[in-house]
């Protein structure tokens, strides 16, 4: 996978068109303005990196174990589908913003379907955050190790109230702020 910095979807798609007939090379994540992730066959990802370099575009190869969020993950999605098809999902108490569609979902059958699709589909993080902002979501909490998503939210919405929770101390601090 390749992180492309300082470029937008259209520019990257134009570069991908030059090599796509050779195999799989797809936008995997639309993270934030100027941060797009591409996934696919490693040879094509390397070729794309060379094309981007020729066009004076910055990119960084990501040390990942698989080409996530692209059609090369179809077999993994099929496996996931078979694993969860007999699992009962309840209706959530709150709508979930699906990263596949960047829209709300609360139907258990649809959630299950989207959990499978997210394995091979583009992550629409920027669109998801913009959807939430347009629907009056004002506080963004990232729960888990790291602060990558918090940083992406701030790139999308510079004035957003966003923070990350990485420890018990962070939970106490967030609770005291509320």
Tell where the protein language model's regions lie, with residue ranges.
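Alpha/beta catalytic cores of group-transfer enzymes, especially the acyltransferase/condensing modules
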Residues: 1-120
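Acyltransferase/transacylase module recognition
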Residues: 88-178
């Amino acid at each position: 996978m390749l992180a492309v910095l300082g470029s937008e979807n259209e520019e990257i798609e134009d570069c991908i068109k030059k090599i796509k007939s050779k195999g799989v090379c797809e936008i995997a994540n639309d993270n934030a303005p100027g941060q797009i992730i591409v996934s696919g066959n490693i040879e094509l990802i390397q070729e794309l990196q060379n094309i981007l370099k020729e066009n004076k575009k910055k990119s960084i190869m990501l040390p990942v174990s698989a080409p996530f969020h692209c059609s090369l993950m179809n077999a993994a999605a099929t496996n996931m589908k078979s694993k969860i098809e007999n699992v009962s999902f309840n209706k959530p108490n709150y709508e979930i913003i699906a990263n596949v569609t960047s829209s709300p979902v609360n139907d258990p059958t649809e959630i299950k379907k989207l959990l499978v699709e997210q394995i091979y589909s583009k992550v629409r993080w920027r669109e998801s955050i913009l959807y939430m902002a347009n629907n009056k979501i004002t506080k963004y909490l990232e729960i888990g190790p790291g602060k990558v998503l918090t940083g992406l939210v701030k790139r999308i919405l510079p004035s957003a109230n966003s923070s990350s929770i990485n420890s018990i101390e962070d939970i106490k601090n967030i609770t005291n702020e509320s």
